[in-house]
């Protein structure tokens, strides 16, 4: 009788121990399932978006024909166009994709930097020089270069010092983007997130997928814009807003075709 009672007590104790363990396993299993699902969703983000997958818009619309097999709509901005086969090699494709995104971001910042001083100057804000390609030349003037026209901010008189600061600042940003450093571990150097996304704009996978498309589309436009700013500076010697005003005032006399036909080499 005592032995039977002891065995019954042991069985009850075993059941009472198993219940919490099973409950814990169930909860942990659910957490792991949620984590796994969240990671899976993040990997396949954009699968329901019109900008991804086989049915995404192509570079020639319905006349695009068959696109290369390696352009399958997995990445943002893929319109199926690679006539020269520049991205047929997977490693080259990955490298070109990273270069395009990074150059697009710098171009967007550059375009903003070209337009903003000229726009502020037209609004009454005084600058030493508002035209973007003339501003840097002030460093060679007798008084040097004052940032925002204020000598109490940054007063620069050495082009080498400015060059060194640019290398350090831009190099630090790129280094943190690729290697992490003080900003934490980086799992994706193209979209590092973390401290590079303080507002948490990319927390939702679907929103993140759409933002990737918007970024690369605007970045490509910005790269073309910067190229146009360079050409305008060489041909007209004016800033982009001044060129725009001239074109709006007299579109026939101020356009690319008119300047091209009037161009004389050596003059």
Curated annotation (Swiss-Prot):
* Modification type Phosphothreonine: residues: 40
Query: Mind telling me which residue stretches traverse the membrane in this protein?
Result: 101-121, 153-173, 221-241
Annotated chlorophyll a 1 binding lies at 81, 87, 100, 220
What does the note accompanying the cofactor annotation read? Binds at least 14 chlorophylls (8 Chl-a and 6 Chl-b) and carotenoids such as lutein and neoxanthin.
Organelle targeting peptide span? 1-37
State the post-translational modifications: Photoregulated by reversible phosphorylation of its threonine residues.
Residue stretches in coiled coil: none
Q: State where it is primarily located.
A: plastid
- Which residues of the sequence carry a binding annotation for chlorophyll b 2? 105, 154, 183
Its cellular-component GO annotations read:
chloroplast thylakoid membrane; photosystem I; photosystem II
UniProt-annotated binding residues for chlorophyll b 5: 166
- Please name the Pfam families in this protein's record: Chloroa_b-bind (PF00504)
Q: Indicate which residues the UniProt annotation says bind chlorophyll a 2.
A: 103
Annotated positions binding chlorophyll b 1: 59
Family affiliation:
Belongs to the light-harvesting chlorophyll a/b-binding (LHC) protein family.
Tell me the function of this protein.
Answer: The light-harvesting complex (LHC) functions as a light receptor, it captures and delivers excitation energy to photosystems with which it is closely associated.
Q: What is known of its domains?
A: The N-terminus of the protein extends into the stroma where it is involved with adhesion of granal membranes and post-translational modifications; both are believed to mediate the distribution of excitation energy between photosystems I and II.
Record-given protein name: Chlorophyll a-b binding protein, chloroplastic
Organism in which the protein naturally occurs: Physcomitrium patens (Spreading-leaved earth moss)
């Amino acid at each position: 009788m005592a032995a039977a009672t002891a065995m019954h007590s042991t069985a009850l104790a075993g059941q009472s121990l198993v219940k919490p363990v099973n409950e814990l396993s169930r909860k942990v299993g659910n957490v792991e399932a949620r984590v796994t699902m969240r990671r899976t969703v993040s990997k396949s983000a954009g699968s329901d978006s019109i900008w991804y997958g086989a049915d995404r818009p192509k570079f020639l619309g319905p006349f695009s024909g068959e696109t290369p097999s390696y352009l399958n709509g997995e990445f943002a901005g893929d319109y199926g166009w690679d006539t020269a086969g520049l991205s047929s090699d997977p490693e080259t494709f990955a490298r070109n994709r990273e270069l395009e995104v990074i150059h697009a971001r710098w171009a967007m910042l550059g375009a903003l930097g070209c337009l903003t001083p000229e726009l502020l100057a037209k609004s009454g804000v005084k600058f030493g020089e508002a035209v973007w390609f003339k501003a840097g030349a002030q460093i060679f003037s007798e008084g040097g270069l004052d940032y925002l026209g204020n000598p109490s901010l940054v007063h620069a008189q050495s082009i080498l010092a400015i060059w060194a600061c640019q290398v350090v600042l831009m190099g630090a940003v790129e280094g943190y983007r690729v290697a992490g450093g003080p900003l934490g571990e980086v799992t994706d150097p193209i979209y590092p997130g973390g401290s590079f996304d303080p507002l948490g704009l990319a927390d939702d996978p679907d929103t993140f997928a759409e933002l990737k498309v918007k970024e690369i589309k605007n970045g490509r436009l910005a790269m073309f814009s910067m190229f146009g700013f360079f050409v305008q500076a060489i041909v007209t010697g004016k800033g982009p807003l001044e060129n725009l005003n001239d074109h709006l005032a007299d579109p026939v006399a101020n356009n690319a075709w008119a300047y091209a036909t009037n161009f004389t080499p050596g003059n």
